[in-house]
């Protein structure tokens, strides 16, 4: 039997609301991956890998939404540093960090709301929990979604 302590995280958020027209929001998150640890057994080597091969990271999310009568328009940006120190040393032009954006539209027909959204995220991962940097994976993920809400 063992226990695993995950990374610690501190988040600060803020938003400014422009009456009923719109808003701008901002989130900042600091994560400490070096304090991850197994306990309850002989995990010294693994815990030293966490301390040596992972780092503190920063992440930001910025978003906005505006209303024009029944139409709502949204947009956002995200950036998160890769916690892997091997990736941080080996990446170029911050390609080892996660970046992305999102866009959305919604229209309120009264008793029916239609919403469409798009999200794009790019990152380069260096996979392997215990030996970071073994495998590099470039990914570009796009997601479209749609929602129809009916008020009865």
Language-model features, listed with the residues they occupy:
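Outer-membrane beta-barrel porins/channels
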Residues: 1-152
């Amino acid at each position: 039997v063992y226990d695993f302590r995950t990374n610690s995280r501190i988040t600060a958020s803020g938003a400014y609301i422009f009456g009923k027209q719109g808003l701008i929001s901002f989130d900042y998150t600091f994560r400490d991956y070096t304090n991850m640890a197994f306990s309850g057994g002989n995990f010294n080597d693994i815990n030293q890998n966490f301390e040596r091969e992972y780092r503190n990271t920063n992440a930001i999310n910025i978003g906005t939404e505006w209303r024009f009568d029944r139409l709502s328009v949204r947009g956002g940006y995200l950036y998160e540093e890769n916690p892997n120190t091997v990736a941080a040393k080996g990446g170029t032009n911050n390609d080892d960090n996660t970046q992305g954006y999102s866009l959305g539209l919604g229209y309120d027909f009264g008793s029916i709301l239609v919403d469409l959204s798009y999200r794009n995220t790019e990152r380069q991962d260096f996979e392997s929990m215990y030996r970071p940097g073994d495998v590099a994976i470039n990914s570009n993920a796009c997601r479209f979604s749609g929602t129809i809400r009916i008020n009865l």
